[in-house]
Amino acid sequence: MDEGGGAGAAAAAAGNAAGAAVHHNARSAEDVFRDFRARRAGIVKALTTDVEKFYRQCDPEKENLCLYGLPNETWDVTLPAEEVPPELPEPALGINFARDGMIEKDWLSLVAVHSDAWLLSVAFYFGARFGFDKEARRRLFTMINGLPTVYEVVTGIAKKQTKVSNGSSKSNKSNPKPSKQSNSNSKPAKPPQPKDEEDSGPEGTEDEDQAYMCGACGETYANGEFWICCDVCEKWFHGKCVRITPAKAEHIKQYKCPGCSSKRSRE
């Protein structure tokens, strides 16, 4: 990351260009939600699959840094925009200063909470700019509320909530849960699906609860997607979220997700 005003200007340019794209092309709640979802995906990636890189970039010795989620599903840690007032609402300032003074998981959770607030502020900023009426604002909020928050994904709360939602309605299709294998070559390319309420019973295991959502982005499984399971934490991930293809998975004897790999390297 570049130092000084140049980095801040670059961040402002990136954020403002993204905002300009939405300004010119989007006029509906669905368009703003797509922008929200992409920025959220970038931030989730920073705090999960790219956490080692994110941790390094948040150097407490540097100036006030911010975490930006970008509309192309990437992220950037850089200085805040120099423009006053900024084109878009700004994320929390100085996230790097608390890094070494907190337990890592607590620090990541704090960044996640501030990121959730920023994502909402950007989405409803666009809503105000586009003159959304009550119904459009309600529709936008409903779509946003259908996704787990960044905080819920980072802390694992989203996986626990899945059990409640799955138990409240019956599934039309029952898919048995595949057995865990120690070798990734023999693992199925998709995660286990929620069982029918009558089959699963009132009590489910922690492992079953965590299998329904991607450990990186928090999204649920869709037919035809390639997923892979970590042999260490036994969480499931979209192949695209952890940059693993079916061909690459064939040659992996024991798969470790980015989170487990980064923990081992720092111990």
Curated annotation (Swiss-Prot):
Residues 165-188 have a biased composition (Low complexity). SMART domains: PHD. It is found in: Nucleus. Residues 162-207 are annotated as: Disordered. Residues 196-207 have a biased composition (Acidic residues). Disulfide bonds: none annotated. Its main location: nucleus. The record marks Y221, W227, D231, W236 as: Histone H3K4me3 binding. A zinc finger (PHD-type) spans 211-263. InterPro entries: Alfin (IPR045104), Alfin_N (IPR021998), PHD_AL_plant (IPR044104), Zinc_finger_PHD-type_CS (IPR019786), Znf_FYVE_PHD (IPR011011), Znf_PHD (IPR001965), Znf_PHD-finger (IPR019787), Znf_RING/FYVE/PHD (IPR013083). GO terms for cellular component: nucleus. Keywords: Chromatin regulator, Metal-binding, Nucleus, Transcription, Transcription regulation, Zinc, Zinc-finger. It comes from the Eukaryota. GO terms for biological process: chromatin organization; regulation of DNA-templated transcription. GO terms for molecular function: histone binding; transcription cis-regulatory region binding; transcription coregulator activity; zinc ion binding. Belongs to the Alfin family. The PHD-type zinc finger mediates the binding to H3K4me3. Histone-binding component that specifically recognizes H3 tails trimethylated on 'Lys-4' (H3K4me3), which mark transcription start sites of virtually all active genes. Interacts with H3K4me3 and to a lesser extent with H3K4me2. This is PHD finger protein ALFIN-LIKE 7. It comes from Oryza sativa subsp. japonica.
